[in-house]
Amino acid sequence: MELLGLPTLALLVLVMSLSLLSVWTKMRTGGRLPPGPTPLPIIGNILQLDLKDIPASLSKLAKEYGPVYTLYFGSWPTVVLHGYDVVKEALLNQGDEFLGRGPLPIIEDSQKGHGIVFSEGERWKLLRRFSLMTLKNFGMGKRSLEERVQEEARCLVEELHKTEAQPFDPTFILACAPCNVICSILFNERFPYNDKTFLNLMDLLNKNFYQLNSIWIQMYNLWPTIMKYIPGKHREFSKRLGGVKNFILEKVKEHQESLDPANPRDYIDCFLSKIEEEKHNLKSDFNLENLAICGSNLFTAGTETTSTTLRFGLLLLVKHPEVQAKVHEELDRVIGRHQPPSMKDKMKLPYTDAVLHEIQRYITLLPSSLPHAVVQDTKFRHYVIPKGTAVFPFLSSILLDQKEFPNPEKFDPGHFLDKNGCFKKTDYFVPFSLGKRSCVGEGLARMELFLFFTTILQKFSLKALVEPKDLDIKPVTTGLFNLPPPYKLRLVPR
């Protein structure tokens, strides 16, 4: 094999030298950043992380450097917050200073600061407020949000009955239900689960969800300026993001032809009405680009996350038949087997509510929230974090806190019950993060999880294909997400 030519070798040395200089400069001029392991040129602290179990690596580093420490991803510093006290202090007590959105280049480069998730400043405040109010106001003379979710729960149960108590993988069916709810919210339409248009949309969302954890995406997020010129699967990811956006824009065109501002049918109608109201404001953030990206954000955040939580939840109930039996008993006693569950039943179902909370705590679907960033030079404890620095609130460190949740590695609904069997709230329940940047769809997700979960358990007994004690429930840690291991089960009608 030939040695590298002198020009190539010189270029390589130059790149490494510049990278080392960049890291050194940031460390010298970075205010008083929290302590952390010494980064290497180009790769930063990647070698200190087990990419197959990043949460374990972050907890290990916290033991060495404390609850606030600095890691370098590539050449860029990131402040990690470990534990409830520091996360609360940053996101609640100093929330306005930590309100920025940290980098996630693979999505950021496609959405370019539009939509809800990756926008900043006044645009973010405006679009978030509009989206929250629109979701809240569903039902003003129309079908309420709860009615839309209940309708989908009935359709989901009909599909599950078609399995005829035979072994099946629930992944696809459970993903269809929350995706259809988003379709109903955005453009007042739901699809049969075998509809070709719907299947194409599901394919785009599903592939991107799983590819977020791939080595290609991780490399892009570390070195976006280089990776954008290199062929690879990261380009397929961006194309699929564009596919979801184009799907929404087609629906927008249909709505523009039949829009009645006095009688909005859905989210798209409400947004189009705002565009019309502000058509003379050339700087208005109510435009088609923000509409398309807001819709994409709702699909991305509201489909796979909810379905994965449901899928993991069913697996845990198959693993723990004694818990499933208590849920069945409570549902039969409070609701019966024929009346559709509704949100007003939640207060009367403390054990079921505790099980749902424990599922979300135990699986820690998102070990870390999406990255934040400080919007100004920020004094935090004994440190000064420079403006624009990324911040990772490490949610797993809260959800698995040993003082708040004794034996946190054990699945135990008792974590959310008091001595009288009543539901027990805790500030440490943070699967949707904390503060003003918490998940905009939290209310919808909580509603979906409750109504889908109770409707399924009302109608079916969940049966394992092996002895429950032999079931593997260890999360598959893939980087950004904790996913359930693949499994099949039987649903036996009750």
Swiss-Prot record:
Q: Quick one: which pathway?
A: Lipid metabolism; arachidonate metabolism
Q: Which reaction does it catalyse?
A: (5Z,8Z,11Z,14Z)-eicosatetraenoate + reduced [NADPH--hemoprotein reductase] + O2 = (8R,9S)-epoxy-(5Z,11Z,14Z)-eicosatrienoate + oxidized [NADPH--hemoprotein reductase] + H2O + H(+); (5Z,8Z,11Z,14Z)-eicosatetraenoate + reduced [NADPH--hemoprotein reductase] + O2 = (11R,12S)-epoxy-(5Z,8Z,14Z)-eicosatrienoate + oxidized [NADPH--hemoprotein reductase] + H2O + H(+); (5Z,8Z,11Z,14Z)-eicosatetraenoate + reduced [NADPH--hemoprotein reductase] + O2 = 14,15-epoxy-(5Z,8Z,11Z)-eicosatrienoate + oxidized [NADPH--hemoprotein reductase] + H2O + H(+); (5Z,8Z,11Z,14Z,17Z)-eicosapentaenoate + reduced [NADPH--hemoprotein reductase] + O2 = 8,9-epoxy-(5Z,11Z,14Z,17Z)-eicosatetraenoate + oxidized [NADPH--hemoprotein reductase] + H2O + H(+)
What family, per the record?
Belongs to the cytochrome P450 family.
Which sequence positions carry the modification called Phosphoserine? 131
Residues recorded as bearing N6-acetyllysine in the entry: 253, 379
Query: Which cofactors, if any, are listed as required?
Result: heme
Q: EC number(s) in its UniProt entry? A: 1.14.14.-
Residues recorded as binding heme, renumbered to this chain, are 439
Q: Which GO terms describe its cellular component?
A: endoplasmic reticulum membrane
* Main location (coarse class): endoplasmic reticulum
What function does the entry list? A cytochrome P450 monooxygenase involved in polyunsaturated fatty acids (PUFAs) metabolism and signaling. Catalyzes preferentially the epoxidation of double bonds of PUFAs. Converts arachidonic acid (ARA, C20:4(n-6)) primarily to stereospecific products 8R,9S-epoxyeicosatrienoate (EET) and 11R,12S-EET. Plays a major role in the formation of EETs and hydroxy-EETs (HEETs) in kidney. Via EETs may inhibit the epithelial sodium channels (ENaCs) in nephron segments, preventing excessive sodium absorption during high dietary salt intake.
InterPro entries named in the record: Cyt_P450 (IPR001128), Cyt_P450_CS (IPR017972), Cyt_P450_E_grp-I (IPR002401), Cyt_P450_E_grp-I_CYP2A-like (IPR008067), Cyt_P450_sf (IPR036396), Cytochrome_P450_fam2 (IPR050182)
Name of the protein this chain belongs to: Cytochrome P450 2C44
GO biological process assignments: arachidonate metabolic process
Q: Where in the cell is it found?
A: Endoplasmic reticulum membrane; Microsome membrane
Query: Which residues belong to the signal peptide in this entry?
Result: 1-25
**Alphabetized UniProt keyword annotations:** Acetylation, Endoplasmic reticulum, Fatty acid metabolism, Heme, Iron, Lipid metabolism, Membrane, Metal-binding, Microsome, Monooxygenase, Oxidoreductase, Phosphoprotein, Signal
EC category: oxidoreductase
Which Pfam families does the entry mention? p450 (PF00067)
| Tissue specificity as recorded in UniProt | Highly expressed in liver, particularly in hepatocytes and bile duct epithelial cells (at protein level). Expressed in nephron segments. Prominent expression is detected in proximal tubules at the corticomedullary junction (at protein level). Also expressed in renal cortical collecting duct. Lower expression levels are detected in adrenal glands.
Q: What induces it?
A: Up-regulated by high sodium or high potassium diets. High sodium intake increases expression in thick ascending limb and distal convoluted tubule. An increase in dietary potassium intake induces expression in distal convoluted tubule and cortical collecting duct.
Any one Gene Ontology MF annotation carried by this entry is: heme binding
**Null phenotype?**
Mutant mice have normal development and lack symptoms of disease or organ malformation. Become hypertensive in response to high sodium or high potassium diets.
